[in-house]
């Protein structure tokens, strides 16, 4: 069994890797049930090319809430370069970090 990421930033990075690999199961497991959509499959045809962490607020091993601002870069099916910028909220419940969504989601 794979160890659960100990910080919000590490969970966010593992979720980026899940997008790169097309690992819908990891995305499902790490998405908070209160905001998780029915379909967590990554967008087919996107080639993820990079990730930059812009800022981190809390989200350490001692915290129960955290915010990670990041930009993920990808090339879409039509060959166009794109980026996804998000200020993402994470919560830790039962010693596991979960992705909630954009930081304005309660």
Stretches found by the model and what they are:
Residues 3, 15, 21, 62, ...:
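Exposed, flexible binding/inhibitory loops of compact, secreted disulfide-stabilized domains
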């Amino acid at each position: 069994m794979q160890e659960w990421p100990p910080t919000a930033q590490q969970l966010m990075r593992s979720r980026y890797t899940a997008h790169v690999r097309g690992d819908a199961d990891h995305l499902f497991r790490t998405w908070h049930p209160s905001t998780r959509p029915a379909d967590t499959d990554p967008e087919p045809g996107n080639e993820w090319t990079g990730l930059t962490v812009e800022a981190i607020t809390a989200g350490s091993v001692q915290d129960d809430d955290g915010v990670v601002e990041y930009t993920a870069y990808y090339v879409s099916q039509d060959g166009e370069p794109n980026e996804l910028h998000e200020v993402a909220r994470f919560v830790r419940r039962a010693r596991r970090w979960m992705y909630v969504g954009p930081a304005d989601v309660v």
